[in-house]
């Protein structure tokens, strides 16, 4: 593989009993924002073969991938694929049994382009299918992007020097204007020094005015329609609906996401980590997220907890967030930071037995007192090349757990009430 990659997700997509891989390309060095190559790698007895062209040709250049998730969104017991990235739509690929088909636009996600960083799954509305939390850049930024007036990124070798030149453009008062300063643009494209002589002229120039000076014959454009970190509701009909998470979740880019039933009420809550320190000097750091817990209150409503109530107060340039099983059969949250130490936080003690997924098991259906059910998936690969433990943390209301393999066959049924009696 000759690609600078950032995401790896595993699943048995050919149903032969071993783990195959999707490897997402992140960037072409020196050619930002050209799409790098991504790969579907088929596991043939420990040897991996690139089958991207045969399975889904469009995945080769899907975009600048930051995260991917194998997930059964339509409950047909075949692993589908969702891919997110920078200036990409939330890209949904349905497993047809013979290949992967891009259903992004028909699924209602035609205007979902964002600066996406991360994704994970959870059944948040008790309807037996998987919903998703998708981490974005947030709304605490110098620019504002909407589907009606998206942030745009035009790119080409505008000055014909062999390097790709990106030009970000924002909408203000009926026109698009360059986001970068004149100094930054002329450093990138010195030809502009002879064309735009005064700062006053640049201040009055639209993006079209600047591009008209340059060679735009091979220009391409990407865009960002939405900045918010969202809950992606699975409507169960091959359609999805975006719900922005509460305002505190929009304070900074979201990088790490954990879905876990923290208060043991049978509904998954959300833990978010993030920030971004690698920014332009004129922009400043995105550093307003200290870790955030969103309590699931039902009806796709989430209540942000204060740091005093949640116990989370994480400084730094946060990246992955995972749940690990401790030696005392309880669980902990582990958060990595860019250039810093990892942070560990004990989850509230459950006093319940943890149930481990066995090899070959990919999902479980929990039944609770009162009759409602919740589906849980166990993934191979998470955000920033991380992975949570393959164990279930049970609430006191759980009665039964049915585990399933990759083909939808139930592998075992556990009477949780009986297990509790043994403790």
Where is each model-derived feature located?
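Asp-box/WD-like beta-propeller blade repeats and closely related beta-sheet repeat scaffolds
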Residues: 1-13, 35-36, 51-57
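Beta-propeller blade termini
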Residues: 5-15, 19, 65-75, 79, ...
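Glycine-aliphatic tripeptides that mark coil-to-beta-strand junctions in extracellular
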Residues: 17-23, 77-79, 128-134, 162-170, ...
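Structural signal for beta-propeller blades
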Residues: 30-31, 37-40, 89-92, 229, ...
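Beta-propeller domains
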Residues: 54-97, 109-116, 199-203, 208-266, ...
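Gly/Ser/Thr/Pro-enriched helix-cap/hinge segments flanking short amphipathic alpha-helices
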Residues: 56, 101, 139-152, 161, ...
